[in-house]
Amino acid sequence: MITDQNSKPQQGELPTTHIDALTNSFSQFLRIEATSGAVLLLATVVALTLSNSPWSDGFRSLWETPIGIQIGAFQFLRSLRDLINDGLMTLFFFIVALEIKREVVLGELRNPRMVALSVVAAAGGMLVPMGLYLALQHGQPGQHGWGVVMPTDTAFVIGCLALLGSRVPPGLRVFLLSLAVVDDLAAILVVAVGYSRSIDWTALALGAVGLVIIRGMALLGVRNIRVYFLAGAIIWLAVNASGIHATIVGVILGLMTPTAGWVSDQRLGEILRKVLSYPPGDHWSGDTEDNRALQVAGIAVRETLSPVERLEAMLHPWVAFGVMPLFALANAGVPITIKGLINPVSLAVMAGFVLGKPIGVTAFAWLGVRTGVAIRPAGLTWGGLVGGALLTGIGFTMALFIAGQAFQDATLNAAKLGILAASVVSSVAGLTLLCALPRSDGTPMFRGRRGGGEHP
């Protein structure tokens, strides 16, 4: 039996064991903002390396492996890549929707004046790249890929900001994260509306009935998360059969998730005071009433957190360090060739991200502030905003996802090369500018050492 007699917890903290030293360090590792982006980058490098190696054929065929089940007349068969893109990515979209709802109800997006700049800038960061892409691809086979250049990859942007650490003004961090939330919401709508197949209305109606049932369970007070996941899986199957991209199920369920806890803070305080009223010591009776009080306290502590907060804390590590790297491995692998890089689709994608994104974000943000629609956060200079706008050209995850819906074969490979090249150029350009900008005290955000070891 594990005991805590050798542990020395601080007052008000839980006792610890030897294994906690390892698990707590790992938890801290997962909480580092840059880690998710670093793991995603590593998966991308692995995919690109294997796709341009002697093992490329085997690597590509791995993701085409058919996987499925058959029960009587019912058969569900998909390739491994499709299961990741359509199935596991539903969890990614679910997390995105949870973050959007949390920010709208509880976070930075509550204040219309604070969020106006991000909304206006995000609109420019989607419309200008899309317009530039369509101008270059009008009447061409790649015209259907207009949605590829709209999104911003939150994980990579956060990773870039984390590299700069405390040198990043808080206003810039809030601005970019809010902008990425708006971008994600728009990208979700693009996938649902712009890249769905012909619709089977019967299957779609079954999915809608499932959503009504989930809403009814919530109103009745059903709190077992497993029941909701089972219902969500059934709804996913129905929507997948309808022709609408099934990842939209994750979005809808995320937006339906309550933001209020079942147990109020006042009720929690009353329950904990009852437990604390027992005299301290080793004479805990262990009778049914005492055990019941502890069980109620445990449930109350858990249920004080809203379902949005609990689900985000539970699923986010799995999505960030499992689903997204798998997605990168399955989709980022593409043969790197000069012919692919100079393909008109690749060049249009690069132009949309590298030029369209920063121009659109900066111009619309300036117009928003100039017209009084939005205000610039304290500490966020125009130079910092331009540096952040350059980082929004990192499309990656959502861009690869939309490209997979819009293109096939050679055109898809060209779009992927454009996305990867644009992400590299945008990250280097954004970081370089942000490092060169002065702090509020007039010193550069980044300074290197001179040969003599003295600082300028």
Curated annotation (Swiss-Prot):
Locations listed in the record: Cell inner membrane
Catalytic reaction equation(s): Na(+)(in) + 2 H(+)(out) = Na(+)(out) + 2 H(+)(in)
Listed Pfam families: Na_H_antiport_1
Keyword annotations of the record: Antiport, Cell inner membrane, Cell membrane, Ion transport, Membrane, Plasmid, Sodium, Sodium transport, Transmembrane, Transmembrane helix, Transport
Membrane topology term: Multi-pass membrane protein
Gene3D superfamilies: Na+/H+ antiporter like domain
Membrane-traversing stretches: 32-52, 87-107, 114-134, 145-165, 174-194, 202-222, 233-253, 318-338, 347-367, 382-402, 417-437
Keyword Membrane: yes
Top-rank taxon: Bacteria
GO molecular function term, any single one: sodium:proton antiporter activity
A cellular-component GO term for this protein: plasma membrane
GO biological process: regulation of pH
Main localisation: membrane
Similarity remark: Belongs to the NhaA Na(+)/H(+) (TC 2.A.33) antiporter family.
Its job: Na(+)/H(+) antiporter that extrudes sodium in exchange for external protons.
PANTHER family, per database record: NA(+)_H(+) ANTIPORTER NHAA (PTHR30341:SF0), SODIUM ION/PROTON ANTIPORTER NHAA-RELATED (PTHR30341)
Protein name: Na(+)/H(+) antiporter NhaA 3
